[in-house]
């Protein structure tokens, strides 16, 4: 969306902005805003992102984790991240399987320039609210179990819910919602 819309949202009190695409992030970047990378991130784009964002919400593989560590170590910075979980098990979505989340947490904790902050997911594309609710409930249970095991230092955020399902996500413990189209309007591709 146009930069003017971001400015207007900022003037209305929005401070954190998410972007799905690295190129669009680079075009819209303003250092006054807190930027989160929320879309799929390829390893070769990490070097372009780490200087621009305050959090990467879409970490879903060990090679990506290693590249973030490498780029952050070069800059002597620590990057807050969320682990993206493919809660709906949809093949067209990114994220690690729910069953692998605990093992992936252990990997994240090995890197000194990575600051694990929680989990992120994208709900299933479904008209059936009970299907979405079931996925969100599973995410909530996973988040709470990991928070109990590792502490709130590593599990501060459950980023779950977008413009179409954020109300349901809030019922299941989300404390970070991603409201792109409801605030900015639908994307023009």
Predicted regions and their residues:
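Conserved alpha/beta-domain cores
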Residues: 1-150, 154-166, 170-172, 184
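Gly/Pro- and small hydrophobic-enriched strand-loop and loop-to-helix capping segments
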Residues: 174-189
């Amino acid at each position: 969306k146009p930069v003017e819309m971001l400015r207007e949202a900022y003037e209305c009190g929005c401070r954190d902005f998410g972007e799905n695409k690295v190129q669009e992030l680079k075009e819209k970047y303003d250092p006054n805003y807190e930027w989160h990378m929320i879309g799929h991130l390829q390893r070769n784009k990490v070097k372009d992102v780490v200087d621009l964002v305050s959090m990467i919400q879409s970490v879903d593989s060990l090679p990506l984790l290693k590249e973030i560590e490498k780029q952050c170590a070069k800059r002597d910075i620590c990057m807050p991240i969320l682990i993206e979980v493919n809660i709906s098990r949809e093949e067209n979505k990114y994220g690690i399987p729910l069953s692998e989340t605990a093992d992936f947490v252990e990997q994240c904790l090995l890197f000194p320039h990575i600051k694990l902050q929680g989990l992120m997911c994208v709900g299933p594309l479904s008209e059936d609210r009970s299907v979405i609710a079931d996925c969100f409930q599973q995410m909530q249970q996973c988040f709470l179990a990991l928070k109990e095991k590792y502490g709130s230092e590593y599990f501060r955020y459950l980023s779950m819910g977008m413009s179409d399902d954020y109300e349901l996500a809030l019922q299941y413990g989300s404390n970070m919602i991603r409201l792109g189209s409801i605030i900015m309007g639908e994307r023009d591709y």
